[in-house]
């Protein structure tokens, strides 16, 4: 039997918990080194929970993060201020552009002070911490043999703080709906960073009160901390095989090989909005060939995310934290600690502004 867990975050957390009960089969005995070498290295490495060489989790479809922009409302701002999409390549660049957008929108109503609009939001704060730190050369959760060491650096954490909490408090960033794509739809932000697998949910219209208008979009890479390495988050789906007799475990491994072969896997990801797991499948040529041969209709937003990531694939490293006890809870602390504080403090500040204080006060 196959244990399957598809997640936009961490399927390895669930698989690790089952493996701790000694219930997962070691898949490495059913794959040759040559076979495993065809898969994206970091995807395979995620399945090695210990230093014993046993492979417990096999990748079947992955995702990472991208930035999507409301092109329709971006263009007037960009033209008026000389801002370019290239400025969004770094986390610090996004902060600078967000400030510029806030000030530009504030200027549209000179008789109303401090009413500028937020530019940006992000779906996953844990990814912001984990990937931001890794881009700057540190692992916030350093894991070895299932044991985690919390590895913080005050200067690096300060950089993350300065590029989320500070702009959030100043009104440059926002997080109002359940997801940031919701905030784009309501016109509360112009751009956000989120999972490639969620691209299909980027809205086709903005709805503000009784007003609604269609929007186009821009897809670009997720930002890198200034001066940091081009590292992106690795998340998505994997399969693990529960322990059984050799015949059933072998049959499960044959299925995994079939399901992840180039053509089959690309057909699946085109319909699920995930990324393929073989190195050779992560190319625009391979994608286009499978789409044409099988007459597949792919959502245009999903296709644009695929091509954006595939064009940069060979220059990108993917990263996810190793599995450890309570790793899911640890990620949730990162997800909510800074975000909740920023929201609570911002609400308090907005109330003070409503009572007559200026934003700077």
Model-found features: residue ranges?
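Alpha-to-beta junction loops
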Residues: 1-10, 186-195
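Hinge/lid segment of periplasmic solute-binding proteins
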Residues: 2-66, 214-223
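A ligand-binding cleft/hinge motif common to bilobed small-molecule-binding domains
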Residues: 11-19, 196-213
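Short, solvent-exposed loop/beta-turn-alpha elements that line the ligand-binding surface or hinge
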Residues: 26-39, 83-89, 113, 119-120, ...
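Extracytoplasmic/periplasmic solute-binding protein
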Residues: 47-67, 92-149
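Glycine-centered hinge/linker elements that transmit conformational signals in sensory
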Residues: 95-102, 143-177, 217, 222
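Extracytoplasmic/periplasmic substrate-recognition and gating elements
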Residues: 158, 169-170, 207-282
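Conserved C-terminal helix/tail region of periplasmic/extracytoplasmic solute-binding proteins
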Residues: 296-361
């Amino acid at each position: 039997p196959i244990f399957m867990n598809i997640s936009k975050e961490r399927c390895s957390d669930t698989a690790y918990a089952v493996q701790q009960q000694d219930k997962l089969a070691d898949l490495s005995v059913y794959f040759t080194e040559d076979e495993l070498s065809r898969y994206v290295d970091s995807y395979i490495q995620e399945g090695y929970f210990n230093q014993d060489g046993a492979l417990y989790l096999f990748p079947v479809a992955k995702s990472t993060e991208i930035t999507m922009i409301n092109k329709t409302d971006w263009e007037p701002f960009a033209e008026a201020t000389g801002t370019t999409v290239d400025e969004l390549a770094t986390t610090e660049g996004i902060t600078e552009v967000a400030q510029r957008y806030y000030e530009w929108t504030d200027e549209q109503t000179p008789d109303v002070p401090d009413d500028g609009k937020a530019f940006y939001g992000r779906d996953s704060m844990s990814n912001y911490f984990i990937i931001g730190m890794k881009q700057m050369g540190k692992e916030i959760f350093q894991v070895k043999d299932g044991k985690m060491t919390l590895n913080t650096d005050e200067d690096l954490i300060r950089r993350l703080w300065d590029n989320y909490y500070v702009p959030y408090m100043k009104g440059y960033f926002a997080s109002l709906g359940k997801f940031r794509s919701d905030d784009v739809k309501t016109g509360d932000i112009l751009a956000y960073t989120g999972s490639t697998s969620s691209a299909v949910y980027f809205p086709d219209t903005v709805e503000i009160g009784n007003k609604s208008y269609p929007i186009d979009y821009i897809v670009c890479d997720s930002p890198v901390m200034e001066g940091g390495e081009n590292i992106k988050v690795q998340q998505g789906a994997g399969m693990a095989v529960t322990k059984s007799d050799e015949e059933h475990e072998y049959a499960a491994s044959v299925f995994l090989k079939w399901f992840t072969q180039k053509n089959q896997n690309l057909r699946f990801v085109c319909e699920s909005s995930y990324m393929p797991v073989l190195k050779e499948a992560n190319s625009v040529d391979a994608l286009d060939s499978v789409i044409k041969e099988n007459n597949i209709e792919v959502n245009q937003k999903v296709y644009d995310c695929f091509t954006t990531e595939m064009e940069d694939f060979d220059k990108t490293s993917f990263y996810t934290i190793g599995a450890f006890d309570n790793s899911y809870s640890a990620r949730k602390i990162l997800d909510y600690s800074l975000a909740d504080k920023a929201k609570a403090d911002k609400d308090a500040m907005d109330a003070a502004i409503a009572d007559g204080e200026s934003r700077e006060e």
